[in-house]
Regions:
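NTP-handling and nucleic-acid-processing catalytic cores
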Residues: 1-101, 172-206, 210, 227, ...
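Catalytic adenosine-cofactor/nucleotide-binding cores of aminoacyl-tRNA synthetases and other
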Residues: 146-150, 339-343, 347-429, 520-523, ...
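Residue patterns forming the tRNA-binding/recognition surfaces of aminoacyl-tRNA synthetases
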Residues: 1-7, 24, 68-224, 263, ...
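C-terminal low-complexity, glycine/proline- and small-hydrophobic-enriched intrinsically disordered tails
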Residues: 518-705
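Short amphipathic alpha-helical coiled-coil/interface segments
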Residues: 197, 397, 440, 444, ...
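Acidic, turn-prone loop/beta-hairpin segments
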Residues: 219, 238-239, 341, 374, ...
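Secondary-structure transition/capping motifs at alpha-helix termini
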Residues: 38, 50, 88-95, 126-136, ...
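Alpha-helical recognition segments enriched in aromatics with Gly/Pro capping
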Residues: 17, 62, 90-102, 209-211, ...
Length: 705
């Protein structure tokens, strides 16, 4: 609503827009922007406040936005935090017109005294209209704070509170980060930290709640009436750790040795919850006593937390640690993204959208919860999470159990000892054996490097890929029919034990249990005390022939295996059928290496024969090109050539139709002139894909002719 405020100059008035008409009796000024030339002439003048007859000044302050409303705002220092600051700058009177329970008091005027604030709003607007002060009412979208428990509108009001002076505490905490003694990871968060700390305000630490740490301030009793209690701030007080110490200080302060505990009354307010939280790095270790834990664990190395509490918690722990312990509480502050709900909203009590970790643990397991969160939480951005996301961790736990069971079965069937690490004989190793060891070496190096850089998500993904893909998908399958089972089992035990240790920070329960069941650990031992894997020594790598060349060769061989399996699927060859294949290598030396892999390839291909040739001549069968050459699948006796020829012809016709459709668009001048460049480039890229597909389809058409 807009309120016309009659001025003192004849019948002049100024127009004020407000969303809080009920606070009008508490107004002590109206304000304009200093650069707003429309109102330069009235700055410093007085106006009469409607319905009260009280004169209030017109002031200028940068807080006022010229373009907002009428460009003039009413200032109520006792009932708005921004108005309070304006009032401080201009030394305005603070008139509190409400009681603690949201009713108007006597300062609001006799007519409104006792009314509920919302009832008063309606009454004031009606009276303004009746007196001719109301110009008009219009709808306005406003951000109104509500209590998350009772959903009542929160009312800002003036009250006496306890504050901590923060600037002297902030200065050494700023210096600790600027000097490099403490660093943020990623570093960009240090700018946010500096911005808050360099513009820090005194901290209001008192809260009017029933629960919490009670403020250790004690008043010397005087008038015990309600009116006397309301004047607590005028009574002498002391601050002390205990009531007994408070009594000693009260006696010293007043000079009255006859004071007793009955003469002291502790302040009823409690401390802001962050006031106890900022002591966390040392209060949990026995402080203020000088304990062994405090001496050993303070300061710690790393703090890992989310960006939304850098100021509320991180900065305050820095200040408290330096003030009380004379050194920062941690060396590295690792900031990760916020874990949000499935809709991207921050989890909060008011929204009721927080996930219950106990429910997740009950349904998926504690390890699944830990690993899944590590896998989706990054340093770079926020992440969305719902219950289904924890299936990843649960499925991974199952994979670990199944792999462990396979090892137990193999040990029992072949008489292998899981408890003792068998020596690895370099002369007995195949290329797949060496590849597994190199993959383990690379995984250990990668995980150590990523954890050293606090890339916890990337390290989790690296361990996941190493265990699931390299160990389970490939090497376990190889080990089932390995030509040298003893060598394969020795390697499998070695890499499995390393994988469990790499996984332990993420999944401590399943890795600990499996390590004991497999005999890697004795009774009373724990992975926590085991060495974190670093890879292999130079001597071991030399003795076992572990090179990047071996690794790359087996990776290319696996690419060929995947291609052959894709061909089988494409032509719907029965998984049980044995096929005939040909590998055409790029060079003769590659062909020689591949001949040594024939038995392994026959098992992987499920082939009755694998012919190795070299050269460039195209063979009359479907094939897929890879790094080592082209793998071909003979379809003789496996597919209905007539049916396949018909299928290929239909697909060829459909693909050619798609190309014609794209050509029609690209030849349309209107489309080219108005379509976004990205759309046009996308159409061209799609056309190139279809052209390549046609080449393959034409080859197949010849094959089935």
């Amino acid at each position: 609503s807009a309120l016309g405020v009659k001025g003192v100059l004849n019948t002049d008035y100024i127009m004020v827009a407000t969303t809080r008409p009920e606070t009008l009796p508490g107004d002590t000024a109206v304000a304009v922007n200093p650069s707003d030339e429309r109102f330069t002439a009235i700055v410093g003048k007085n106006v009469i406040l409607p319905l009260t007859g009280r004169e209030i000044p017109v002031i200028s302050d940068m807080y006022v936005e010229k373009e907002f409303g009428t460009g003039i705002v009413k200032i109520t220092p006792a009932h708005d935090p921004n108005d309070f600051l304006v009032g401080k700058r201009h030394n305005l009177e603070q008139i509190n017109i409400m009681t603690d329970d949201g009713h108007m008091n006597e300062l609001a005027g006799a007519k409104y005294c006792g009314m509920d604030r919302f009832e008063c709003r309606k009454a004031l607007v009606a009276d303004l209209e009746a007196e001719g002060y109301l110009d008009h009412i219009e709808d306005y979208d406003n951000q109104v704070g509500h209590c998350y428990r009772c959903h009542e509108v929160v009312e800002s009001r003036l009250s006496k509170q306890w504050f901590v002076r923060m600037k002297p505490l902030a200065e050494p905490a700023i210096a600790a980060v600027k000097s490099g003694e403490v660093r943020f990871v990623p570093d960009r968060w240090s700018k946010i930290y500096f911005n808050w700390m360099e513009n820090i305000q005194d901290w209001c630490i008192s809260r009017q709640l029933w629960w919490g740490h009670r403020i250790p301030a004690y008043y010397v009793r005087g008038d015990s009436s309600e009116e006397g209690k309301a004047k607590n701030e005028e009574r002498p007080f002391v601050v002390a750790e205990t009531p007994e110490k408070a009594l000693e200080r009260a006696k010293a302060m007043t000079g009255n040795d006859k004071l007793t505990m009955a003469d002291l009354e502790q302040d009823e307010d409690v401390l802001d919850t962050w006031f106890s939280s900022w002591l966390w790095p040392f209060s949990t270790l026995g402080w203020p006593e000088k304990t062994a834990d405090l001496d050993y664990y303070y300061p710690t190395t790393d703090l890992v937390t989310a960006q939304d509490i850098i100021f509320f918690w991180v900065a305050r722990m820095m200040m408290a640690g330096i003030h009380f312990m004379k050194k920062p509480p941690f060396a590295n502050i690792v900031i990760h993204g916020i874990v949000r709900d499935a809709q991207g909203r921050k989890m909060s009590k008011s929204l009721g959208n927080s996930l219950d970790p106990l429910k997740i643990i009950d349904e998926y397991s504690a390890d699944a919860l830990r690993f899944s969160l590590a896998l989706i939480t990054s340093l770079d951005c926020d992440s969305k999470v719902d219950m289904k996301k924890f299936e990843v961790g649960r499925n991974f736990s199952t994979k670990i159990w199944n792999a462990a069971r396979f090892m137990q079965m193999q040990a029992e069937a072949n008489g292998f000892d899981l408890a003792a690490a068998a020596p690895i004989d370099g002369a007995a190793l195949s290329s797949d054996d060496r590849h597994m060891l190199v993959a383990c070496e690379k995984a250990c190096e990668k995980v150590n490097d990523l954890l050293g850089k606090y890339r916890i998500q990337d390290a989790a993904l690296a361990v996941y890929d190493f265990f699931w893909t390299q160990i389970c998908d490939w090497y376990v399958e190889y080990a089932k029919d390995a030509p040298n089972k003893a060598a394969a089992f020795a390697i499998l035990r070695d890499v499995f034990w390393k994988a469990l240790r790499l996984l332990h920070p993420y999944m401590p329960f399943v890795t600990e249990e499996v390590a004991h069941q497999l005999g890697f650990l004795k009774e009373g031992e724990t992975i926590l005390r085991a060495e974190f894997p670093k890879g292999y020594t130079a001597e071991e790598k030399a003795a076992w022939g572990l090179t990047d060349e071996v690794y790359d060769f087996v990776e290319a061989k696996r690419e060929m295996i995947t291609s052959l399996r894709a061909l089988r699927a494409e032509y719907k060859v029965s998984p049980a059928a044995f096929v005939k294949t040909t590998i055409q290598c790029h060079a003769a030396e590659v062909a020689e290496k591949m001949k040594a892999e024939v038995e392994t390839l026959k098992k992987a291909f499920r082939a009755e024969s694998v012919d190795i040739v070299s050269g460039e001549a195209e063979l009359a069968m479907p094939g897929i090109l890879g790094k080592l050459g082209t793998v071909y699948l003979s379809l003789e006796g496996l597919v209905d050539k007539a049916a396949e020829a018909k299928r290929v012809a239909t697909e060829l016709q459909k693909t050619q139709g798609f190309i014609k459709s794209i050509d029609a668009k690209l030849s349309n001048e209107n489309f080219v002139a108005h379509a976004p460049a990205a759309i046009i480039e996308g159409q061209k890229a799609k056309r190139a894909e279809l052209e390549a597909k046609i080449v393959q389809l034409e080859k197949l058409a010849k094959l089935f002719a």
